[in-house]
């Protein structure tokens, strides 16, 4: 079997063989350090009793490592130019299926049912995500309720900081809440920019998301809950009142009544959104939802 893909020499050899040119628009940066790949699969807790979905396999470096440790791997690749390369680099493995397509447009549950020989095995999602589509992909996987026990992503460190943030920090925001509402988030380790080809401008990080048995807080309307959280961070330096009144103008004539009601449940509208934890946002959105329905 050929040596691991994730080395500078082997990666360069593959790229030259196929005359492959990186597409900046697809955020293509290939990992050239196999030690990082081992740490990713260890973080994801992949075993031979695990099915894995990978997004953006590139030339197959992470895919190869996943295939060594998982039962079966299904990889989504959007760039048609990479399909013959993957056929070549992964030819030694019989437990990999490469699906040509955009995961953002795919029916992932249908792919799971059709592509995995044993679709009922525990599922994990692992990916080196392109920076430009990181947030849309993660939110799609959450909102489509893909039955994955965990998701392990390598992504831009700044985004990993936002996903794993705690209240009253500059990284904490609506993205934090959108993900931590459903998942426990752990920033596992930092990945220096020097282990990629081509080298990106910033460092990356690996984040591990583990599905909660129940959402972190009870809300009456999830869609409205996320609408309230996004509004609360619309302008970070503004108070809850200023942001919410801008989003929901019907609140303005009833400010005194609203202040009194929220004070009764421990929420002061002079606070900023970044100071509220997820259970407090749940109380806020539940109260606001009922309040706005009143005549």
Swiss-Prot record:
Its EC number is 2.1.1.182. The keyword rRNA processing applies. It catalyses: adenosine(1518)/adenosine(1519) in 16S rRNA + 4 S-adenosyl-L-methionine = N(6)-dimethyladenosine(1518)/N(6)-dimethyladenosine(1519) in 16S rRNA + 4 S-adenosyl-L-homocysteine + 4 H(+). It is found in: Cytoplasm. S-adenosyl-L-methionine binds at residues 29, 31, 56, 77, 102, 128. Signal peptide: none annotated. It comes from the Bacteria. One of its GO terms (molecular function) is 16S rRNA (adenine(1518)-N(6)/adenine(1519)-N(6))-dimethyltransferase activity. Keywords: Cytoplasm, Methyltransferase, RNA-binding, rRNA processing, S-adenosyl-L-methionine, Transferase. Its main location: cytoplasm. SUPFAM superfamilies: S-adenosyl-L-methionine-dependent methyltransferases (SSF53335). The keyword Transferase applies. GO terms for cellular component: cytosol. InterPro entries: KsgA/Erm, rRNA_Ade_diMease-like_C, rRNA_Ade_Mease_Trfase_CS, rRNA_Ade_methylase_Trfase_N, rRNA_adenine_dimethylase, SAM-dependent_MTases_sf. SMART domains: rADc. Belongs to the class I-like SAM-binding methyltransferase superfamily. rRNA adenine N(6)-methyltransferase family. RsmA subfamily. Specifically dimethylates two adjacent adenosines (A1518 and A1519) in the loop of a conserved hairpin near the 3'-end of 16S rRNA in the 30S particle. May play a critical role in biogenesis of 30S subunits. This is Ribosomal RNA small subunit methyltransferase A. The gene is rsmA.
